[in-house]
Amino acid sequence: MTHSANEGAESDLSPIAPLRQPVFRMLWLTWLMANLSMWMNDVAAAWMMTSLTAQPIWIALVQTAATLPMFMLGLPSGALADSLDRKRYFLITQLWVASVALFLSLLLFLGWVTPLVLLALTFANGIGLAMRWPVFAAIVPEIVPRAQLPSALALNGVSMNASRILGPLVAGTLIASVGTIWVFLLNAVLSVVAAVVISRWQRQAQVFPLGKERLLPAMRVGFQYVMQSDPLKGVLLRIFLFFFHSTAVLALLPLLAKDLPGGNEKTYTVLLASMGLGAIVSAAFLPRLRKRFSRYALVLRAALLQALSMAAVSLADQLWIAAPAMFLGGAAWITAANTLSVSIQLGLPDWVRARGMSIYQMALMGGSALGAAVWGQVATWTSIQTSLSIAAFFGACGMWAVSYWKPDIGSTEDTNLRRLPPEIDRNGASVHGKVSILIEYVVAPSRVDEFRDLMQVEGRRSRLRNGALSWQLLHDIQQPGRFIEVIVDDSWVDHLRRFDRSTEADELLRHKRLEFHIGQNPPRISKMIIEESH
């Protein structure tokens, strides 16, 4: 890691403390420009679709096209961000977004944009966002102290919501005065400026002692890590449900704005700005809220407030009623999103952080994409107001139910130890194929059940989290106290990687295992190559 924090930085827990660090401040401004471009693009695309067609499903599909790539490409992008130099990867994603914006501007100039073309290019822009988000999420914990991570993530939320205000304002002004094409051109310019800032970042090149991981195995390991953690799965379930219902208000907002008296692009801008302002104001109070409530309680309360605000928006027949409701929705949105983001960040070690955050992104964007399509179709069958009301009711009931089914959204507060086994030849030049590691334990008969429970739950999860291909526990029939743990790795290099990934929690678990062993010598370890038939 490249933490530049000293003791003073660790003790500075004010909401703006991370901005006092030059690297974070530079990246935060870059993220602000990137988010500003994203919101300008989304607003312009959504409003343009209303001029191309009046069908609610087409308009809602703009939101689906923008978010679906993040669901489809989340894990591959996270694996790449963990396996490649993050600075270069971040730079490439920005240049992609700029290229898409320029191409869309050209098609608009030629008059070749149709609803299908607009959706396709919105999808292409979403590809750039899908590739960009995991790498930025993985970089932030590198440059701020762990104690300041909640504040750093809240500031990223402020960046998102400041752009949620400024983006629609700028886009609305340009659309009303000079036309939509200028929104996409400005989007391209801001993306290029952000790319220039990233290129000037003096980041030490990443070193991969064991070489870069292959894409498919890296994806498998990232998925395994998250799936072997109940707290992380609880976070993923909550973020999926929260965005599945809350995306309804964003997907249908252009039509809601038009339905209000005198509704136009300015009405749409005011509603989006109200939501963004609510999020910014709420971010200032998040440190106090975190001290008063647990993460579990914060997420549940925020979800219920979000559902209530959606119901109010669906019933509002005047802008002065809808805008305050959107303000409350924005406050609830950042409270829930920030709390869940902090929970998963604190539960991920550096080696798998981008992959873990990409799976979080998949859950978030999958919920958004599916929700936009579902609630758009419900609006087509019924009405916009009915669709929003049903979404609000579903969100409140769903989040309340999951809070009792999976109440744990805590995280393991550990860091990498980088513990390397000195007795192992790390070159392994002559080793090819899958590797099987056999570890033999001798356990007192009275403690057999206790040992089995430890190994089959904590032991299994630890091995699979760190990348093992498979795991088994064998119990000797003739010697009841004799167990053999069988760990299969995809290759010799992947076997070595597991030692680089050990955390304090893994080390504590190793001591627990050894406490059960009563043999005169340490547990016997055998390393085998699996001979496969041809």
Per-range role (PLM):
Residues 9-68, 228-273:
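Helix-loop boundary and gating motifs at the non-cytosolic
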Residues 26-42, 66-81, 85-100, 117-176, ...:
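Substrate-agnostic recognition of the 12-TM MFS/MFS-like secondary transporter fold
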Residues 46-53, 105-110, 166-186, 259-261, ...:
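Transmembrane alpha-helix termini and helix-breaking/packing motifs in multi-pass membrane transporters
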Residues 62, 72-76, 83, 89, ...:
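C-terminal transmembrane bundle of multi-pass solute transporters/carriers
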Residues 138, 142, 184, 188-214, ...:
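Helix-loop junctions on the cytosolic side of multi-pass membrane transporters
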Residues 378, 434-442, 472-501:
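Short, well-ordered beta-strand segments in beta-rich or mixed alpha/beta enzyme
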Residues 382, 401-432, 469-482, 508-534:
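Glycine-rich beta-strand-turn "strand-cap" elements at beta-sheet edges
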